[in-house]
């Protein structure tokens, strides 16, 4: 697969050959969905907590005598059916993370990249760099490229000026190649890769 390479200014900068093993697969929604669910499960805090009957601070004395009241038999005021009692099967602090094999994660990333390429939502630029961290200037570049909602992936190290200028632009994310992931690819309309990012991806999946 061959794609044109453009500069931030919108000028042509040659072309790049993309590997069909990474960008030319037929996207499988089930694999992508498994990876997205794995990511969302992993990032849940799991800090929710409700007290059970054993954790409630309340007297352990029997509420009232066993017989003669006409009421139901009760031994403890800490049980869930009473106001102020413990919660039955309440949430506890736990990890929501699930397991997903590394090979499935790698395959899901390939399918997410292939989905963007197939839909025409993949753009390749020569480099993501600015001399001065000016948000207004970067907005002009994005407007010229038709980008309003995009994920930009650069090489191993981000250009400080570019990253600082993009930080305050809504719906635009900038990540180094180490941070590329299925969820962030799918949550943005366009995927922008630099030539350095493509080289790193092909080396990773070699």
UniProtKB/Swiss-Prot annotation:
Alphabetized InterPro entries for the sequence: Ribosomal_uL4, Ribosomal_uL4-like, Ribosomal_uL4_dom_sf
Residues forming coiled coils: none
Keyword Secreted: no
The keyword DNA-binding is assigned to this record: no
Keyword terms, alphabetized: Ribonucleoprotein, Ribosomal protein, RNA-binding, rRNA-binding
A Gene Ontology term for the protein's cellular component: ribosome
Entry's Gene Ontology BP terms: translation
HAMAP family documented for this protein: Ribosomal_uL4_B
Record-linked NCBIfam families: rplD_bact
Protein name in UniProt: Large ribosomal subunit protein uL4
